Amino acid sequence: MRGEPIISMKTGVQVLLSCLKRNQSAKETVFVSIITFGDHASEAVPLTSVQDLAVPDFEPHGCTMLGEALELLARSIEEDVVMPSAAEKGDWKPIVFIVTDGEPCDDVRHGLDDLKRGCVDTIVACAAGQDTSLDPLRSLTENVIRLDTAGSHTFESYLRWNDISDD
C-alpha cells in the first residue's frame, strides 16, 4: 500500500475514530483493536477503549495476508468478547472494518468462516484507494465502501447505539 491508498486508509481510520469519539455511548462502551496485515498479520493495537486509543503510524509492507488477519481476528474475538449468558450480560457483538488496497495473497475462506461463525454483528470492507478492485471485498461482505468517498455519515450508518433503560 503506497501513495493515495495509504493516505486514504489513514484518513478513513481517523474519520471512523472521530465518529466514535464524538458519541457519548461509544466513548463509554466501544473498544478497538487494530490488526495489520502485510507479510504477516499482527495485532498492532490490543483491545483498547476508544477514548484511550492512540493510532500508530501505519507503514505499508509486503503482500496482503488478509486470510491470516481474519484468523487472528477470529481468535481474538473468541478470547476477548464476553458472550451473553444467563449469568452475564456480555458484550456487544463486534463490528469489523477491513481496510485494504488489494487482493489477498492468501486464502481468506478459513478465516472468514471462523469470523462468521463467531459473534460478529457486521463486517464492512473498506477499499483504500480509488483504483482498488471491489470484487475481492464483495466476496467478504455485502457491506463495501470506498474510503476516498466515505465521510462520517458513511461510518455512522454502521454504528448504532440504543439507549436501553430499565423501568
Give the location of each predicted region.
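Von Willebrand factor
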Residues: 1-45, 51-92, 95-99, 122-136, 143-167
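Short, well-ordered amphipathic alpha-helices
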Residues: 13-21, 73-82, 112
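Short, flexible, mixed-charge acidic loops at enzyme active sites
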Residues: 44-52, 140
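Cysteine endopeptidase catalytic domains of the caspase/legumain-like
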Residues: 21, 44, 81-88, 119-120, ...
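Alpha-helical scaffold elements adjacent to nucleotide-binding pockets in ATP/GTP-utilizing enzyme cores
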Residues: 8-12, 16, 69, 111, ...
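VWA/integrin I-like adhesion module and closely mimicked acidic/polar interface patches used
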Residues: 7, 102-140
